Amino acid sequence: MEWDADDLLIEPTTEVENDYEDLCTQWVNERMAPDLLPFAEEIVSRVLDRIEAQRETLQLAIGTSSATSYRSVLMQTELERVKFVLRSYMRTRINKIDKYAQYIQSHPNLLLYLSSPERQYLLRHQQIVHRHYMDSFLREVPAKMNKLDDKVGNLSMVASPDMDTAVFCVVNESVEENFRVSENEYITLDKGDVLILRYSVISDYLRLGVVSLI
C-alpha cells in the first residue's frame, strides 16, 4: 500500500497553537525581565514532546513519498521556528544564570525557579568559578578577604538584577483595585492597556499572568 505524505501530516490543533503562543509569551517575558523568571516546565515539556512527534511524522512522510511535498516543507519550516524560540528561551535563562549565579544561589526562593538541569548547571558553574579564582589569586590573600560575596556599605561584590529598570507591559486581565506605582501615585490596570513601569512594581503581576512584557 502506498502512503501519501500529506495523509501523514497533521494540521496543528488549537491546543498546539496555544502552547506555541504560551511559549512565545514566556520567551518574551524572560528576555525583557531583568531577573530570572520561574521555568515554564509544563509548557516546555509539552512543546518538546510535540517537536519529537512532529519530527518522527515528517521523517515518515518524507520516507514514504517519492518527492517532498510542499506541505511537508512548510511543516519543517514551522518546526524550525518553534525550535528557535525554545532554544532562545533556554539560552536567555542560561545567560542570566551565568550573570547572576552568586545572587541566585544565595536566594533559596530563586533556586525554585530553576529546572533540574539548570540547578546542576548553576552548581557546576559556581564550582568552576570558585576553583578558578582560588587557583588564580585567592590562595594568596588572607582568608577574611577571599570571600566572593562581601558587602561594604551599599556596595556588594554580588551582581544582582536591576529591579527598578523600566519595562513595557500589556495588561492581560483588568484589576479592580487601584494599582500603586509610587508612594503617591496610583493607576488602574485595564485589559489591553500598554504601560511603561518600573519592573519592581509589576513583577508579581507578571508571575501571575495579569501582565506580559513586550
From Swiss-Prot:
UniProt entry tagged with the keyword Ribonucleoprotein: no
Any GO CC annotation of this UniProt entry: GINS complex
Gene: sld5
Predominant cellular place of this UniProt entry's protein: nucleus
Family per similarity comment: Belongs to the GINS4/SLD5 family.
Subcellular location as annotated: Nucleus
Function: The GINS complex plays an essential role in the initiation of DNA replication. Has a role in chromosome segregation and is required for bir1 localization.
Keyword match Nucleus: yes
Biological processes, Gene Ontology terms: chromosome segregation; DNA replication initiation; double-strand break repair via break-induced replication
Entries under PANTHER family matching the protein: DNA REPLICATION COMPLEX GINS PROTEIN SLD5, SLD5 PROTEIN
SUPFAM superfamilies: GINS helical bundle-like, PriA/YqbF domain
Species classification: Eukaryota, Fungi, Dikarya, Ascomycota, Taphrinomycotina
Keywords assigned by UniProt, alphabetized: Chromosome partition, DNA replication, Nucleus
Protein name: DNA replication complex GINS protein sld5
Subunit structure: Component of the GINS complex which is a heterotetramer of sld5, psf1, psf2 and psf3. Interacts with sld5.
